[in-house]
Amino acid sequence: RLDGERRATFHRLYTDFFYHRHNRFWQESALRKLPVLLSATEMLTCGEDLGMIPDSVPETMHELQILSLEIQRMPKTPGELFAEPAHYPYFSVCTTSTHDMNPLRAWWEEDRELTARFYHEALGIGGDVPYFCEPWIFRRILDMHLNSPAMLTILPLQDWLSTDGELRYPDAAKERINVPSIPRYHWRYRMHLPLEELLRKETLNESLHDMIACSGRR
């Protein structure tokens, strides 16, 4: 059993190795390799900087002009339960979920307490919380994202369709794309409407066009 002084020494070694030396190592590696990849194409680059990442990642991405990924349910500011789309950086892509997350409709039904906090705090709406994520709620959420300062707003097709109660998929759970913990559950989602039918939905198309136009995006 180590005494207090030895424990503190091992803690300093551990902290330096994992949070300082490794940070510098991966940053130096990125600055050596990524510019070669970035210069090989004219594509705009986005990095998936979610979850636990080294402290050097945001600085390195900014230096290389790689857009960050911003998701309201995965805030990057300590102490925040939900990120505020109005505060997203310009050099970012904002969206409501990734392919490995539950889409909004299914997430809404997962945890009633968390949903209530999102409804009251993130959306700023009082009163009882609807059991389902209704189309009007979707429009409000998508408006928040469209009006964010982020350079790009890229939203899942499921969310766009969910702004229309008649066109959205009947089963919210089947809108999920991947479940990382289930090896065979990947890339499962299929749009339930033929493209030809979707093109004929003038009410939906005009509504989405107006939402995008009002936000100043194209």
Where are these regions (language model features)?
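Catalytic cores of glycan-processing enzymes that make or break glycosidic bonds
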Residues: 1-218
